[in-house]
């Protein structure tokens, strides 16, 4: 048996570095967090070759006393905690004292630091060994340079990606830190090229504009909610501004960026059916709570935490997101979706746009902005822009009221005596519809015509609307089924021929565990043998001829989501049924049916999106139409024409 011995300090530091320092972005994160803990109001980050050759962090924080600099490079040396009790109420970003010795063990590190009234100190480590140390002149703060990262651990270099990928990792973490601390001015350069800069004035909206582009920042709304334990404050995107994955959700706990799937999911759940399938919101949410409720000592990078009363927090987040989006106008501007626009702005506006057009790491498109050579701010030039053009906030048609109708009685009061527009649905399948005197929050539309049996055209005082007839009736159906499924009744339709369902042993066990969930929607499965179930009757709202398919889909929801709850199951079932019963594409409606559909969708609680999040209608304003047909004249051109006349 090999002899047990104690590892050398340098080797121990290199092992620790394997957990703390995975790539250049890890070094940037640890050093910038140290700068923030030191009370810095300005942090400059300079890179060469995406940090592999050099990382330099300059801050104006409190600095380190000259006689404590060498101690700072020892393992588990820190000024941030001193007792066991401090570990359970950490109020700083760092606290373990591992970052500096870990980085120094696998790189060439030089630090210059000074406090307000003390002498400066310069120290140099390479591969964990002290190379030089002495007094030096320095302003208050810390200037630390890391070179030749992983020079003595070449195996680590093999796992690094391209320079561009490593740079994107760095800009990603810097952007998230900038969102966490808008009061800190942060700049980032790579190979002397500036990638981002924040003003440090505390305005998070300006930081959002720097990262996502000014125009996209306009599509984010403020959300704030609190209870006795938590305060949440941040910005979430409108459903029209989404991304293909959830990595654009930034969750902060007491200013610390964390990764938490459940919190991200709570944000998404708050959108309900407003998001398209496969699309995710952009969000920045800062959760403030007593540090004693958060355990940050569970992961080497401190990006995973444990939160007490987590379910209460998740419910609070979903509620806040839902309430904030509830009264917003969600009709997308059709012209706004065009990739490029030719617009006329003043020189001063162009300069503002150029300042905003600083590239971020979240895959933002680069826009071309031409700055004219003129001192006259009133001279107008044409400029090509897209996502970063600052437009006014969209006009909210009206605030939504009476968001929920919890009973079928309310639904029937809302829709009485009007026929549902769908001649593919059997008579009596849906309740009759009736107009309700309610606060106007949807444009008054006048039907014009139909295209390809798919889209309806209508006009209003503010322009042209194009309606997706399938999405519109999906929304109407969804709100009906949501009420029906939520009000489980004893009314069941007996099957002439029972449905037999065979499953694997694993699936059968899971189905039995979720019996109450299935029964919450009126679906009763009886055991019929080892792994077989029988269905003898079904809810009356099942579509005729699709009973077996509907049962199988409902069971699949339970099998595919181990955390399926009654509420989620009812929601999924309502969405499924709404799609099955909706008008399909290439189905031509006559004029009375089309007009009825427009009346019905206007009375929906959310007339703007189908249950899958797709828009029900898009809007071309009168101004948009006049621009497209060149009916709006350049004022300078008009003056010339008048002079010629």
From Swiss-Prot:
Keywords: DNA damage, DNA repair. One of its GO terms (cellular component) is mismatch repair complex. Coiled coil: none annotated. GO terms for biological process: mismatch repair. SUPFAM superfamilies: ATPase domain of HSP90 chaperone/DNA topoisomerase II/histidine kinase, DNA mismatch repair protein MutL, Ribosomal protein S5 domain 2-like. It comes from the Bacteria. GO terms for molecular function: ATP binding; ATP hydrolysis activity; ATP-dependent DNA damage sensor activity; mismatched DNA binding. NCBIfam families: mutl, PRK00095.1-3. Belongs to the DNA mismatch repair MutL/HexB family. This protein is involved in the repair of mismatches in DNA. It is required for dam-dependent methyl-directed DNA mismatch repair. May act as a 'molecular matchmaker', a protein that promotes the formation of a stable complex between two or more DNA-binding proteins in an ATP-dependent manner without itself being part of a final effector complex. This is DNA mismatch repair protein MutL. It comes from Pediococcus pentosaceus (strain ATCC 25745 / CCUG 21536 / LMG 10740 / 183-1w).
């Amino acid at each position: 048996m090999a002899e047990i011995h104690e590892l050398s300090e340098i080797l121990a530091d290199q092992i620790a570095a394997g957990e703390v320092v995975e790539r250049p972005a890890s070094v940037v994160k640890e050093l910038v967090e140290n700068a923030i803990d030191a009370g810095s109001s300005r942090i400059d980050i300079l890179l060469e070759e995406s940090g592999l050759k050099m990382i330099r962090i300059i801050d104006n924080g409190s600095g380190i006393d000259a006689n404590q600099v060498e101690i700072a490079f020892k393992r588990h040396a820190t000024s941030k905690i001193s007792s066991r009790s401090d570990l359970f109420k950490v109020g700083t970003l760092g606290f373990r004292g591992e970052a500096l010795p870990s980085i120094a063990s696998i790189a060439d590190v030089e630090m210059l630091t000074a406090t307000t009234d003390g002498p400066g100190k310069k120290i140099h480590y390479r591969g964990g060994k002290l190379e030089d140390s002495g007094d030096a002149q320095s302003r208050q703060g810390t200037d630390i340079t890391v070179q030749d990262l992983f020079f003595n651990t070449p195996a680590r270099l093999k796992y690094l990606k391209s320079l561009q990928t490593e740079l994107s990792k760095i800009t990603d973490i810097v952007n998230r830190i900038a969102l966490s601390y808008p009061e800190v001015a942060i700049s980032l350069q790579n190979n002397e090229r500036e990638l981002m800069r924040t003003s440090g004035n505390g305005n998070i909206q300006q930081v959002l504009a720097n990262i996502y582009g000014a125009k996209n920042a306009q599509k984010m709304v403020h959300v704030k909610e609190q209870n006795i334990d938590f305060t949440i404050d941040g910005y979430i995107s409108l459903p029209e501004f989404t991304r293909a994955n959830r990595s654009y959700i930034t969750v902060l706990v007491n200013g610390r960026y964390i990764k938490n799937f459940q919190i991200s999911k709570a944000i998404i759940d708050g959108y309900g059916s407003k998001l398209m399938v496969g699309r995710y919101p952009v969000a920045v949410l800062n959760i403030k709570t007593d540090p004693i409720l958060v355990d940050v000592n569970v992961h080497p990078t401190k990006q995973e935490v444990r939160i007490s009363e987590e379910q209460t927090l998740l419910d609070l987040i979903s509620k806040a997101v839902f309430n904030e989006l509830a009264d917003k106008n969600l009709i997308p501007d059709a012209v706004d979706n065009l990739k490029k626009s030719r617009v006329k702005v003043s020189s001063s506006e162009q300069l503002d746009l150029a300042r905003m057009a600083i590239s971020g790491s979240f895959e933002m498109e680069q826009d071309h902005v031409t700055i004219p050579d003129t001192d006259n701010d009133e001279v107008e030039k044409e400029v090509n822009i897209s996502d970063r053009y600052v437009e006014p906030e969209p006009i909210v048609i009206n605030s939504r009221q009476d968001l929920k109708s919890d009973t079928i009685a309310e639904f029937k009061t809302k829709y009485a005596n009007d026929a549902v527009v769908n001649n593919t649905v059997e008579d009596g399948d849906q309740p009759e519809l009736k107009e309700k005197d309610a606060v106007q929050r949807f444009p008054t539309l006048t039907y014009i015509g139909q295209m390809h049996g798919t889209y309806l055209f209508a006009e209003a005082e503010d322009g042209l609307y194009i309606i997706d007839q399938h999405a519109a009736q999906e929304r109407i159906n969804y709100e009906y089924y949501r009420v029906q499924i939520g009000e489980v009744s004893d009314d069941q339709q007996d099957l002439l021929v029972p449905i037999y369902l065979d499953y694997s042993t694993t699936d059968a066990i899971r189905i039995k565990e979720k019996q109450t969930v299935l029964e919450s929607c009126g679906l009763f499965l009886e055991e019929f043998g080892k792994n077989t179930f029988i269905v003898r009757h079904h809810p009356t709202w099942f579509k005729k001829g699709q009973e077996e398919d509907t049962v199988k889909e409902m069971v699949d929801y339970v099998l595919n989501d181990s955390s399926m709850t009654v509420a989620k199951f009812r929601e999924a079932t309502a969405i499924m049924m709404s799609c099955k019963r909706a008008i399909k594409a290439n189905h031509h409606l006559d004029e009375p049916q089309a007009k009825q559909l427009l009346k019905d969708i206007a009375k929906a609680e959310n007339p703007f999106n189908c249950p899958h999040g797709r828009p029900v209608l898009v809007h071309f304003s009168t101004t948009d139409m006049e621009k497209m047909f060149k009916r709006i004249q350049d004022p300078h051109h008009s003056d010339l024409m008048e002079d010629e006349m």
